[in-house]
A protein has these predicted regions:
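Alpha-helical transmembrane segments of polytopic integral membrane proteins
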Residues: 25-28, 37, 77-78, 106-110, ...
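Membrane-interface segments at transmembrane helix junctions and kinks
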Residues: 1-10, 14-15, 43-56, 75-101, ...
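Transmembrane-helix bundle segments that line or gate the permeation/cavity pathway
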Residues: 34, 57, 62-72, 99-122, ...
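Alpha-helical multi-pass transmembrane bundles of energy-transducing inner-membrane proteins
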Residues: 1-41
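Glycine-rich, histidine-containing beta strand-loop boundary motifs that form or position
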Residues: 11-15, 23-26, 60, 67, ...
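Hydrophobic transmembrane alpha-helical segments of multi-pass transport and channel proteins
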Residues: 18-22, 104, 149
Length: 188
């Protein structure tokens, strides 16, 4: 988004992305803890029956990162795609590339969810020893889940909406004497 000149959208996405990416990383840590340090997804499967809470919060993080409607990623990704589409000559190309990248993110994210939590257990380790994490690991997951669901809604208007101009005025501006950005279009 910074490369598109949409700095307010970039900061907004940085905040929303921080919630759901942290949620996905900590959820992965909860899975690794629950399966006793195994990290190979091919040796996992059907963990939903043993780790329901971790599965649900990982679903929340996945839905947010793929931009599912009304999750935090939906708001920020939509603004990035909109900013790319509104570029001059390159708008359509950049928009298509970002849409392809978003589709690839959705593919690998859902692949992880279905393989680890809903796939067939392959019997590589003792299934009975798999356990849900305790509250010390789950409480941060709940907090990040809340942010992954609602941060986009709460921060949208402040950081990228009608009131964002007042918020960003004086922080980010383009001087009338600077015209370096026009040479970028010539190179591209």
């Amino acid at each position: 988004a910074c490369g598109l000149g949409a700095f307010n959208v970039a900061i907004f996405h940085l905040i929303t992305h921080g919630y759901f990416k942290a949620l996905l990383f900590l959820s992965s840590g909860s899975v690794i803890h629950g399966v006793h340090d195994e990290q190979d997804m091919d040796k996992m499967g059907n963990l939903f029956s043993k780790m329901k809470i971790t599965s649900i919060v990982m679903w929340i993080g996945t839905l947010a990162i793929v931009g599912f409607p009304f999750m935090s990623g939906y708001y920020s990704k939509d603004l990035i795609l909109n900013a790319s589409f509104n570029l001059y000559e390159l708008g359509s190309l950049v928009y298509i590339l970002l849409a392809i990248i978003s589709a690839m993110t959705a593919f690998y994210s859902f692949r992880l969810i279905f393989k680890v939590f809903h796939g067939k257990y392959n019997g590589s380790f003792d299934y009975e020893k798999i356990h849900e994490s305790n509250y010390v690991m789950l409480v941060p997951l709940f907090i990040l889940s809340f942010g992954s669901i609602f941060a986009g809604y709460f921060f949208n208007e402040i950081l990228s909406g009608n009131y964002s101009f007042d918020f960003w005025r004086g922080v980010i501006f383009l001087s009338q004497d600077e015209h370096h950005y026009s040479s970028i279009y010539t190179v591209l």
